[in-house]
A protein has these predicted regions:
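Hydrophobic positions on the alpha1 helix immediately C-terminal to the Walker A/P-loop
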Residues: 130
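Conserved lysine of the Walker
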Residues: 127
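Conserved substrate/cofactor phosphate-moiety recognition/catalytic segment
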Residues: 135-194
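Active-site Asp-x-Gly
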Residues: 7-53, 57
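Hydrophobic anchor at the beta1->P-loop junction of P-loop NTPases
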Residues: 119
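Small-molecule kinase domains that catalyze NTP-dependent phosphoryl transfer to phosphate-bearing small molecules
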Residues: 240-285
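Conserved phosphate-donor/acceptor-positioning beta-strand/loop module used by diverse small-molecule
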Residues: 218-238
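Helix-rich C-terminal or lid/interface subdomains of diverse kinases
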Residues: 47-109
Length: 285
């Protein structure tokens, strides 16, 4: 939980004080992670909880375990409720904390229907930013699995998200492989009962149709959001990126602006609007 994380020499250090007993210290990693996710959620850090889960799943594909995650988190909340309640006699202020953990444990067991939300748009329109802003609001805590084409492309290439790839990594065959991987992961996550936010350009009508078909086959709700932005803003956004999983450049934006996008029947949103997030949330209801 959050009490077992400290900053040491400027770096986060996790400790559990259980090193004396391997039977306690060595457990299922997803169950261990559930403690941190639960505590972040309880402390009002839903976005951080979702981000943490997604970065873990990027590194270790445990999609099949997602069906158990709400139960794991509920168990962790119940444990914190019990431990905190036993301290309430000497520390009365902890009674409210124990009750809050107990209520959270109940809430975490409420079933949520899986759904697929897809965010498309040309480079520099803010797809990834919106995806992460929405993810913690969807499905069971700590929110949706975010599948980003930029991160998946780097993973398929065997490099870190921040590593820039050569031009051939964006050839048609390579891009087709990225979209195929994204859709396969989306299908697997939906099958596990989780919600998904997919983030990619989806410039081709066939790509948009294919991702919608994933939702239809899974029998879940589908929402497609298409972001549109002033070209000058798009150019400025990609030019300002540092250490970003996206390799898009101003030249890439210029090329994309000439695409024939076909008919876009997704909900179109002005990516430059101050109330973009609010409009996106409304589109999901």
């Amino acid at each position: 939980n959050l009490r077992n994380i400290c900053l040491y020499d400027g770096a986060p250090v996790l400790f559990d004080c259980l090193e004396f007993d391997a039977r306690l210290a060595e457990i299922d990693v997803l169950y261990d992670l559930a403690f941190l996710l639960m505590d972040l959620w309880e402390h009002g850090r839903a976005e951080q909880a979702n981000w943490t889960l997604n970065r873990y799943l990027d590194a270790a594909d445990e999609t099949e375990g997602l069906a158990l995650l709400p139960f794991f988190m509920a168990m962790r909340a119940a444990i914190r409720a019990h431990v905190t309640a036993t301290q309430a006699k000497e520390h009365p202020e902890r009674r409210a904390e124990a009750l809050a953990y107990h209520a959270l444990a109940d809430d975490l067991l409420i079933a949520h229907a899986p759904r697929l939300v897809v965010i498309g748009g040309l480079s520099g329109t803010g797809k990834s930013t919106l995806a992460h802003a929405l993810a913690h609001r969807l499905g069971a805590a700590p929110g949706a699995r975010v599948l980003s084409s930029d991160r998946l492309r780097k993973a398929l290439a065997g490099v870190s998200p921040e590593t820039r790839l050569p031009a051939q990594a964006y050839a048609r065959a390579a891009s087709d492989a990225v979209y195929a991987d994204l859709m396969a992961r989306a299908a697997d996550t939906l099958a596990s009962g989780g919600a998904v936010v997919a983030d990619a350009v989806f410039a081709a009508p066939a790509e948009r149709a294919a991702i919608a078909e994933i939702a239809r086959q899974a029998g879940v709700a589908f929402t497609g959001l298409w972001l549109e932005s002033d070209p000058a803003v798009m150019r400025a956004n990609v030019a300002a990126r540092v250490g970003d999983p996206s390799d898009a450049t101003v030249e890439v934006v210029e090329r994309q602006l000439g695409y024939d996008l076909g008919t876009i029947d997704w909900t179109r949103l002005d990516a430059d609007a101050d109330d973009l997030l609010a409009r996106a949330v409304v589109a999901l209801t």
